[in-house]
């Protein structure tokens, strides 16, 4: 009878050699490595290699046909190479058992960098776009770290066909499936992914698990693993988890509020003890940049037709471009914190949803904020009243603009944005627009008539099974 795999270190590897030593130890039974990368929409793509191939793959990379992935590459330049990043190596916290007695194995996971055959970074790689943005922040603004913490909300349903809630719990009510949230966290912890807390969200069947703050690239990779683990654990319980932004009419949708701050040499650049909101000039300019470019980054942060069914009045989602401290109807909130917790100074961008391409969304929002610093963008006055209840005249007095009404408007604005074109690069910019226009055409063919904020049956059929 075959013995179970030995306990092992599952994360936090310093280099490729340490990964190889762990993988090739026969007692660990790590037989396969999944190499993961995002497609143009941020969905996880992966393929597995046998452990015996890992040494050569670290050295040479692995070739693949990029034209097989929709919107990823032009067919005349389809040959690409992916090189695994050893810093991202983790071991899945379970053991696979096949029908044969000897079929017992573990799997590892690594994110990969996509290269051209000449060894240059591939312009269509979303992960590279975020890396390039972070390099720009270091080079032009002397910012050595952007820390962020997204709040990814999700629904749990009985299956992937009908958005039928499995409970009637509300915000912080116990509801059902607390054990699902706990198991997700236990497995994440075993992979070195820290969480802060979990709770039932406001809508029926809606949940949230908050991830501990990380540097931006690490967080984007972590969010990809998080979405995979949420769905896998739900399946293990005979349920279906979805990050679809708005699956149910008359209920709150799922957001991905992104808390963020800029750091230099271990110092939070957003903190100023003398400002009423404890925000430094850097923070105020950054916040103003996010507001100034809010409409331009919307298509990236809210990339689905269904995303705009969430961004409507009355469901705790932002519609108006304003900021405040306690104001949850605003586009940006500045969370309060206890005295002595100055490192927690941050801003919370409330518009993104968890079905975005998180690499591109991070790149877009960081570039917008940094543009505010570069341009010394003036910060409008805060708005602390409920904007949904403000009269039109008061909204005009505060010069409050609105986010795009729908994906079509968001794409029109994005297409004219030099900031987003430069951030994404020509290849991804054009590919993203083309992909989203096809989506709009399919929506129009299946949902005739004037655009409606109600979630259509078509959206449930089209989005629920894969978001």
Question: Where in the sequence are the language-model features?
Answer:
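Glycine-rich, acidic/polar active-site loops that bind/position phosphate-bearing ligands
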Residues: 1-467
